[in-house]
Amino acid sequence: MKKILILMTFITLISSNASAQDWSISTNLVDYITLGTLNVEGSAATGRHITVNASARVNPWTFHKGDPAKQMQNRQQTYAVGIRYWPWHIYSGWWFSGMAQYEEYNRGGIFSQATEEGDAFGLSLGGGYSLMIHENLNIDFGLSLWGGQKTYISYACPSCGRITNKGSKWFFIPNELRVAIQYIF
């Protein structure tokens, strides 16, 4: 599945023309608050109203690893490819998005000791607004919802290994709260 996403991203990015103001790179500041999730998104314009996007998020951190009562993690690697429609003009004003997303995750110990790990794949729909700060700099605000299927294993705590549930199920959850710094070149 990862190879398919990487191939789709590569084909999408090389198929667009590379003139001025057609490329951007951004990072979502909200992701850093969620236990230090590193993230990047690249975007290429394919016309006046359409951009194609590829993004990745990685969080390898485990906090308080030596203390089972305090251990918490939001470990993940997430990859997405998608498209944005800009009613006015690319990288300016309102936008609507759709994307395919894959995530391998291990979360637990944050709000309770319950921990879940697994793989999730699905589609996301979102929208937002890009505020132009400078000719080459935007602040991008947005929100998206993600639905799909996940295979998972639930544990009683982050470090005990006691399985409480496992299986496969459909999900529909908030995906991304976006306050991103975007550089356009």
Task: State the predicted function of each range.
Residues D22-I25, H64-G66, G108-S112, C160-K166:
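Extracytoplasmic loops and strand-loop junctions of Gram-negative outer membrane beta-barrel proteins
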Residues S24-E41, N59, I90:
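Solvent-exposed loop/turn segments connecting transmembrane beta-strands
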Residues Q21-W23, T34-L38, Q73-Y79, E117-L123, ...:
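Residues that define the transmembrane beta-barrel architecture of outer-membrane proteins
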Residues H134-F185:
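Predominantly the C-terminal beta-signal and adjacent terminal strand-loop region
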